[in-house]
Design a protein with these regions (language model features):
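Active-site helix of classical SDR
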Residues: 148, 186, 194
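Short C-terminal tail/terminal secondary-structure segment
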Residues: 21-27, 252-253, 264-277
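The beta1-alpha1 cofactor-binding region of Rossmann-like NAD(H)/NADP(H)-dependent oxidoreductases
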Residues: 66-67, 87-99, 130, 246-247
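Alpha-helical segment proximal to the catalytic Tyr-Lys
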Residues: 153, 199-203, 261
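Residue(s) in the substrate-gating loop at a strand-loop-helix junction
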Residues: 168
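Substrate-binding pocket helix/loop in short-chain dehydrogenase/reductase
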Residues: 124-125, 132-137, 221, 233
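Conserved glycine-rich cofactor-binding loop
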Residues: 41-42, 65
Length: 277
């Protein structure tokens, strides 16, 4: 066998969806599976973790702040969900390995990885410093890649697993009125990396997809201030509003579950119609 070439395996390898006797709602269930969500102490990540837990997954959330991560995990446990918090920096490979090892030790092998950790800097291109550029690329791309490789290695060995990478319409369009070249570049790379891994790992029974979100009201993207920002972020959206984390979280459940068993290498756009123009 040529070096680097995936072995031939049955098309059903890693396929956990048994169509016989399974109704549509059953396909969204993650009962018995372990999900790991990065950057989940608040906002989108917290919403993703809650949604995955609500459909039956045992969930691990990561953040760089131990106290905040534990607080979020406690809030989710109070809802009746099985959640643990792990602490680490996704830009440090050793941290990623340690977090993955702890998740597997406490909950079991990771079945679903949701790469949500991300940062953004709003600056014109000529004002971006080398340090500012590196921080955004390091978290949004390097950290995501580290998580994909560390967790993906276990998934490939077990011939099953799902990865959902949180991208953005910023990887498809140029946002206005704010300029954010590093963020835009990082999210475009996330989309293409997702496609690349999907093609390479499909023979091993893995699925890899990306979710390209439009404007969502979070700490990173609060409600717009000023008429120009409001026009670009709200009025230019056919639905005339920003999304909320809880209404985009079900898309992660879809991509993580057997409901999307034939989807891989896709970039699912969820933007209220923003990119139709």
């Amino acid at each position: 066998m040529a070096a680097g070439r995936a072995p031939k395996v049955p098309a059903t390898a890693g396929h956990r969806c048994n169509a016989v006797g399974m109704n549509v709602l059953d396909r969204f269930s993650l009962d018995g599976r372990v999900a790991f969500v990065t950057g989940a102490k608040r906002g989108l990540g917290r919403a993703f973790a809650q949604a995955l837990g609500e459909v039956g997954a045992r969930v691990a959330i990561s953040s760089r702040d131990q106290a905040e991560g534990e607080s979020t995990a406690e809030e989710l446990r109070a809802l009746g969900l099985e959640v643990i918090a792990v602490t680490g920096d996704v830009t440090r490979y050793a941290d990623v390995e340690e977090m993955a090892s702890r998740v597997e030790g406490e909950l079991g092998p990771i079945d679903v990885l949701v790469n949500n950790a991300g940062v953004c800097e709003h600056k014109p291109a000529l004002d971006v410093t080398p340090a500012g550029w590196s921080e955004v690329i390091s978290v949004n791309l390097d950290g995501l890649w580290f998580c994909c490789q560390v967790v993906g290695r276990s998934m490939v060995r077990r011939r099953q697993g799902v990865i959902v990478n949180i991208g953005s319409i910023s990887g498809m369009i140029v946002n206005r009125p704010q300029w954010q070249p590093a963020y835009n570049a990082s999210k475009a790379a996330v989309h293409q990396l997702s496609r690349s891994l999907a093609g390479e790992w499909a023979p091993f029974g893995l699925r890899v997809n990306a979710l390209a979100l439009g404007y969502v009201s979070t700490v990173m993207s609060p409600e717009p201030e000023g008429p120009e920002t409001h026009q670009r972020w709200v009025e230019d959206v056919p639905m005339q509003r920003m999304a909320t984390p809880d209404e985009v979280a079900p898309a992660v459940v879809y991509l993580a579950s057997d409901a999307s068993s034939f989807a891989t290498g896709s970039v699912l756009v969820l933007d209220g119609g923003y990119t139709v123009w």
